[in-house]
């Protein structure tokens, strides 16, 4: 009997010390679907929420399109980071030449697991990685959420040639904002639009949004400070180890022509990757 009691007591102590992920059955209906969170590290996690239409087919190398699908139930997806080379240095793991998916415009939200008496400040994280690698899941902001009573949003955005690419086969066949080369920047702006529209449902204050990022993410923060499309979508900005350059639009296009991605991609191949209609 003493041994049985000791085993039971030991089991209870060990079990109570393990951080077990729990389910939160309350569904939140957003503009892109309904989602329930799960509790882990003392915060509620809402993961893999689509914030724009998948940039596939006719939407490849175009500005992100607003998503509106309130009737769908959002479920977590495996491998939804944007296409990149596998990397163990702040990027997505994997084997081979490439990992990831073009269908990658998703965001995660972390909120305190407590009853809120007021709307909380919102912080939107932009990951680094040279704008060629990285993903929304690389850091865990649970401690920040718990310690400072904030809501943290992390996002994926298109990388590499899918995110920043100037080519006659693209620009000559597009109009308006679709003619831009800065698709990754526009993804971040679309994520901010989604947050402004939906974050109050999660207890966040749409009038108190801070963008923050490190390295290339810090560079993207600086880009958003001057992008007219982002005006009014955030209120504070933190650039960690960010960098920026000053160049004209014309000179930027000249630099792009010298880039190997441009020189090694023919008009014919690029056009075949862009269907004629949406």
Where are these regions (language model features)?
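Alpha/beta-hydrolase fold nucleophile elbow
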Residues: 202-214
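Glycine-rich nucleophile elbow surrounding the catalytic serine of serine-hydrolase chemistry
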Residues: 131, 213-223
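Short, well-ordered amphipathic alpha-helices
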Residues: 108-110, 190-199, 221-225, 266-271
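N-terminal signal peptide c-region/cleavage motif recognized by signal peptidases
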Residues: 15-17
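Non-catalytic accessory segments of hydrolases
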Residues: 19-185, 206
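Sec-dependent signal peptide recognition
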Residues: 2-11
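Mature extracellular catalytic domain of secreted serine hydrolases
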Residues: 77-95, 171-180, 208, 219-223, ...
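Alpha/beta-hydrolase active-site loop
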Residues: 104, 177-201, 259-264
């Amino acid at each position: 009997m003493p041994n049985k009691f000791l085993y039971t007591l030991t089991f209870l102590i060990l079990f109570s010390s393990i951080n077990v992920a729990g389910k939160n059955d309350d569904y939140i209906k957003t503009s892109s679907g309904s989602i329930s969170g799960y509790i882990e590290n003392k915060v509620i996690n809402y993961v893999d929420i689509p914030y724009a239409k998948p940039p596939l087919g006719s939407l490849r190398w175009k500005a992100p399109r607003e998503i509106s699908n309130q009737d769908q139930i959002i479920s977590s997806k495996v491998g939804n980071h944007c296409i990149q080379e596998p990397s163990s240095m702040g990027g997505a793991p994997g084997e081979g030449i490439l990992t990831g998916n073009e269908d990658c415009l998703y965001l995660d939200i972390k909120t305190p697991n407590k009853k809120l008496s007021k709307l909380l400040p919102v912080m939107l994280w932009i990951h680094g990685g040279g704008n060629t690698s990285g993903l929304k899941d690389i850091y865990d902001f649970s401690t920040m959420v718990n310690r400072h009573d904030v809501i943290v949003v992390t996002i994926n955005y298109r990388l590499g040639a899918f995110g920043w690419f100037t080519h006659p086969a693209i620009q000559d066949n597009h109009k308006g904002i679709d003619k831009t080369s800065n698709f990754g920047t526009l993804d971040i702006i679309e994520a901010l639009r989604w947050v402004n529209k939906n974050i109050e449902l999660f207890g966040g204050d749409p009038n108190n949004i801070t963008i923050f990022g490190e390295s290339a993410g810090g560079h993207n923060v600086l880009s958003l400070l001057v992008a007219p499309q982002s005006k009014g979508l955030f209120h504070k900005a933190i650039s960690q180890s960010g960098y920026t350059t000053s160049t004209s639009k014309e000179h930027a296009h000249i630099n792009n022509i010298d880039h190997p991605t441009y020189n090694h991609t023919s008009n014919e191949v690029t056009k075949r990757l862009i269907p004629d209609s949406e």
